[in-house]
Curated annotation (Swiss-Prot):
Domain EngB-type G per the UniProt entry, residue ranges: 41-219
Pfam families: MMR_HSR1 (PF01926)
Protein name: Probable GTP-binding protein EngB
HAMAP family: GTPase_EngB
Species the sequence originates in: Hyphomonas neptunium (strain ATCC 15444)
CDD domains named in the record: YihA_EngB (cd01876)
Amino acid sequence: MDAAAAPEFTEEALEAGRLLFAGKAEFVMGVVSLSGLPPADRSEVCFAGRSNVGKSSLINALTGRAKLARSSAEPGRTRELNYFDIGDEGKLYLVDLPGFGYAKVSKTQTAAWTKLIKSYLRGRPSLRRVFLLVDARRGDLMDTDEEVMDLMDGAAVTYQVVLTKVDKVPKGEVEKIVVKIADKLKKRGAAHPVVRMTSAEKGFGIPELRAEIAALAMLG
């Protein structure tokens, strides 16, 4: 499948996505160790990405709640796996992973986060997909993105690249970026072939990402 030409969703799929995120959306807990994880009793998806990639803004756009996920005033300060309960009747956990790649974070902190994230990715049976957020303004994957992909390939955890802030880049350039990244994903065993394009500020790509996540929530 050509990732530059992502398949269209049916009206039913888009409506399922709308309904899921129109329901309950609550912060549940921040987890600092595997012993603190909630029961794996529903599907989980998680958002990963470099610090300041726009994870909090995207979560808020998906849920339609401006302050559900709060970005830290200082990049790299989020040290927890933040769990959000999405949808009525406990349908889905959305997990916001700590941002990576921020230079001012100490090596000790980085090592601790990395260990926690590795353990989570390898040992969470209810994890359906990791959405790896990439700032479109970067123009390509960063080395740290590729390192996280290596980790997920090794753990056999399916992941999908989501471009953020595409409204900040000319349309023609965004399409070139998608093609470039999609070509790299073809060489990776655990990568989903479709690169999603989003803008939390403009709402672009939000209905489609909701539909994508809703389909995963139905896996139970």
